[in-house]
């Protein structure tokens, strides 16, 4: 319990102390923001600060800090450390700079930001990468909720069309089209803050349930410092990839520009971007604590949690909420596992539209231009989603790559932020250090993950268990990170000699 409370205090303190350092390093001023300067009534709309925070939280969170934290809890309370320090020194820094760099560049999408600071080749790579990732996320977050709604209807004894995934998938996709097409203040600005509040209430309810029920005890880090993973999966770098949104997520960089286009003042960035990520870290910490405390531990392994997750992550959420909050928890769980993915899905499609708009220089005040982009984006999503609902397309293999690509995107954004700070003659180490760390994480996982190169490097025991080739992957991952850092330092040294290099950024 004390480990949890200490980490919670560090997260809250990190917002004020380290978040203040990050804000001071960036240096927000009183310049006119894109929302005030452009104000097209569609994507550039001034919103109140509390709505900015809640929408940003819901956009970046969804079920990420719940699913990722529960999976991360398989390693035991050691996951508390990554959630805490990863959020403070990496995730919140990443979210703040991805949002504020966008704000300084007229609300540009992250692919355009990467192009400005990392070069034209990286811009084109990020454009394609971002659109594919966003459409994939949006599609999966349409299929998932549709399936959950069908489960509810079937459990209630309903049959016919309302008990088919295809029916609800079409309804979700129609909603996605509307939310992607219309002004951000019409649906997202009105409803999403309420869902954000529900996400926070659900986390608070789980925390209260854990502390008030004597049968649940949160284990201490110092008593369980080693890995408790039932499958023996290494902490490095699997835990860092698995927790994903609960500590740092590249997907957030695709969402932050949405709110960067709605801020009235640059000084709102600390609360909206850094603060929302810290809040997500707190939510992840609570759910990780739930995973560590509510289930049976056998022989130092989280066998009970593993069994619960084997029934499906949504079922695990339902179980945690019902155990800690009873009937109210069940209602919140249903809202969470259905509404939260939908809210992440539609903003994913909206972000895809904006990435394409920036790519092809199409202003979005015109409804015709929005329609031109919405139709193909949602069309591809519909084809993939309906194909999945009909059993023609399997996302399982594709989705395995999401966690790795997610953290790799975060790595790229942090390197872009480092270049930004170099051009601005600021302390670039504040982003270069987490960029180097995430480079090591991403490369190591790419070598160890069975869906990546691990299928060639790892071996199997007689009973089918994976033996990870850490002797090869660990040193290569570290060396690769050092090489990336060396390339960065060489690049800034070279550019430092160029005349007026500081004018290359805004």
Language model: regions and residue ranges:
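Extracellular loop-to-transmembrane helix junctions
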Residues: 1-19, 72-102, 111, 330, ...
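Membrane-interface loop-to-helix entry segments
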Residues: 9-27, 129, 145-149, 165-212, ...
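Membrane-interface "cap" regions at the ends of multi-pass membrane proteins
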Residues: 10-66, 268
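Helix-loop-helix module between adjacent transmembrane segments
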Residues: 10-11, 15, 56, 90-106, ...
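Hydrophobic, membrane-embedded alpha-helices of multi-pass small-molecule transporters
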Residues: 48-64, 207-215, 224-287, 332-344
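Extracellular/periplasmic helix-exit of transmembrane alpha-helices
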Residues: 99, 209-221, 274-319, 386-393
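Loop-to-transmembrane helix boundary motifs in multi-pass membrane proteins
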Residues: 123-127, 162-170, 275-284, 292, ...
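Hydrophobic alpha-helical segments and their helix-loop junctions in multi-pass secondary transporters
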Residues: 138-156, 163-168, 180, 199-226, ...
């Amino acid at each position: 319990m004390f480990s949890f409370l200490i980490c919670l205090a560090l997260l809250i303190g990190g917002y004020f102390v380290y978040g203040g350092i990050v804000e001071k390093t960036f240096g927000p001023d009183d310049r006119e923001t894109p929302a005030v300067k452009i104000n097209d009534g569609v994507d550039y709309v001034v919103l109140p600060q509390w709505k900015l925070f809640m929408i940003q939280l819901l956009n970046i969170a969804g079920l990420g800090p719940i699913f990722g934290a529960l999976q991360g809890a398989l390693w035991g309370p050691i996951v508390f450390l990554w959630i805490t320090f990863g959020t403070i020194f990496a995730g919140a820094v990443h979210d703040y700079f991805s949002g504020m760099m966008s704000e300084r560049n007229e609300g540009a999408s992250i692919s355009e930001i990467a192009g400005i600071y990392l070069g034209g080749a990286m811009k084109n790579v990020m454009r394609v990468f971002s659109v594919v990732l966003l459409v994939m996320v949006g599609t999966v977050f349409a299929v998932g909720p549709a399936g959950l709604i069908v489960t509810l209807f079937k459990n209630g004894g309903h049959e016919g069309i309302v008990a088919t995934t295809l029916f609800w998938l079409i309804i979700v996709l129609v909603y996605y089209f509307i939310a992607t097409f219309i002004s951000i203040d019409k649906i997202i600005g009105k409803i999403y803050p309420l869902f954000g509040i529900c996400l926070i209430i659900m986390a608070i309810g789980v925390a209260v349930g854990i502390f008030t029920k004597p049968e649940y005890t949160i284990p201490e880090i110092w008593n369980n410092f080693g890995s408790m993973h039932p499958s023996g999966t290494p902490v490095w770098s699997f835990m860092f990839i698995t927790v994903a949104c609960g500590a740092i997520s590249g997907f957030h960089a695709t969402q932050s520009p949405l709110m960067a286009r709605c801020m009235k003042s640059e000084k709102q960035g600390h609360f909206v971007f850094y603060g929302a990520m810290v809040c997500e870290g707190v939510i992840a910490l609570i759910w990780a604590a739930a995973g560590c405390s509510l289930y049976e531990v056998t022989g130092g392994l989280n066998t009970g949690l593993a069994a619960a997750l084997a029934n499906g992550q949504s079922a695990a959420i339902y179980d945690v909420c019902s155990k800690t909050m009873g009937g109210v928890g069940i209602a919140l769980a249903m809202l969470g596992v259905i509404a939260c993915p939908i809210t992440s899905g539609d903003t994913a499609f909206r972000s895809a539209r904006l990435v394409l708009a920036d790519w092809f220089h199409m202003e979005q005040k015109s409804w015709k231009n929005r329609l031109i982009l919405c139709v193909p984006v949602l069309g591809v999503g519909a084809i993939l989603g309906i194909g999945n609902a009909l059993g023609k397309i399997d996302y399982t293999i594709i989705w395995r790559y999401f966690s790795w690509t997610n953290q790799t995107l975060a790595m790229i954004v942090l390197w872009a932020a480092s270049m930004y700070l170099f051009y601005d003659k600021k302390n670039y180490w504040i982003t270069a250090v987490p960029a180097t760390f995430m480079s090591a994480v991403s490369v190591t996982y790419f070598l160890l993950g069975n869906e990546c190169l691990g299928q060639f490097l790892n071996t199997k025991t007689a009973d089918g268990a994976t033996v990870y080739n850490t002797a090869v992957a660990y040193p290569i991952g570290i060396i690769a990170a050092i090489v990336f850092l060396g390339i960065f330092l060489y690049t800034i040294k070279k550019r430092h000699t160029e005349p007026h290099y500081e004018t290359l950024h805004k």
